[in-house]
Regions:
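Cleavable N-terminal export/targeting peptides
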Residues: 1-24
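Short glycine/proline- and aromatic-enriched beta-strand/turn motifs that initiate or cap beta-hairpins
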Residues: 19-67, 122, 191-199
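Transmembrane beta-barrel domains of bacterial outer-membrane proteins
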Residues: 21-27, 33-35, 39-41, 52, ...
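Predominantly the C-terminal beta-signal and adjacent terminal strand-loop region
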Residues: 38-42, 80-86, 152-200
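Gram-negative (and chloroplast) outer-membrane scaffold detector with strong preference
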Residues: 59-130, 190-200
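Hydrophobic alpha-helical segments of small multi-pass membrane proteins
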Residues: 98-100, 118-123, 138-148, 163
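Conserved catalytic-core motifs of eukaryotic protein kinase domains, centered on the activation segment
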Residues: 130-131, 171
Length: 200
């Protein structure tokens, strides 16, 4: 009898956990307005700094899964993101990246369709600087930010957010006879995003 009751208790607990921990795959697309803040630092025989700042548009696509908990949701996704070229005088910077992101959506309860969220991501970034010559390289890309989701139906949600994004620091060294130069590139962006998500 005790074994039967214990087994019944385990089954009930598993059922309760299953109902409290559900997940659904989703696809998402976002448009963004990015305040590109790119810096080049030169050291060696010559020293100096240059900033290539511009405001550009961009976009991203993502696939992921939402894990529904009792007091909020976790979202895990793989995202590809790209910005339009940031230009200044005769130079321009191209940036793109692939990120693995983790978000937490806060449930405000009381049937409110708004869910604030925070999130961070880590992945691969690529930047290309074109001017008198061309320099391009890959590096570690990171993002951190937050925003709010608006659930318009069971499957669709709008997303309004902000994030600080890095596209991978890298450097290049040059030797011209006795002249040595090292250029350090730091592509950054403050990004404001508007997106839509479809959850299956």
């Amino acid at each position: 009898m005790r074994k039967t009751l214990l087994l019944a208790g385990v089954v009930c607990l598993a059922a309760a956990n299953a109902s409290a921990f559900e997940f659904n795959p989703y696809v998402a697309a976002k448009a963004k307005y990015a305040l590109a803040r790119n810096e080049v630092k030169v050291t060696g025989s010559y020293e100096g700094k240059a900033k290539l700042n511009d405001n550009v548009f961009g976009g991203s696509l993502a696939v992921g899964s939402t894990y529904h908990l009792m007091n909020g949701d976790f979202r895990f996704e793989l995202e590809y993101t790209k910005n339009a070229d940031a230009k200044k005088r005769n130079a321009k910077v191209k940036t793109q990246g692939v990120l693995f992101n983790v978000y937490y959506d806060f449930d405000l309860q009381n049937n409110i369709p708004l869910k604030p969220y925070v999130g961070a991501g880590l992945g691969w970034g690529r930047a290309e600087l074109e001017g008198n010559g061309s320099v391009k390289d890959n590096g570690v890309s990171m993002q951190i930010g937050g925003g709010v989701n608006y659930q318009i139906s069971e499957h669709f949600a709008f997303d309004l957010g902000y994030r600080y994004m890095t596209y991978g620091d890298f450097d290049k060294e040059y030797h011209f006879g006795p002249i040595y130069e090292k250029d350090e590139y730091k592509p950054r962006a403050h990004e404001f995003l508007l997106g839509v998500r479809y959850e299956f």
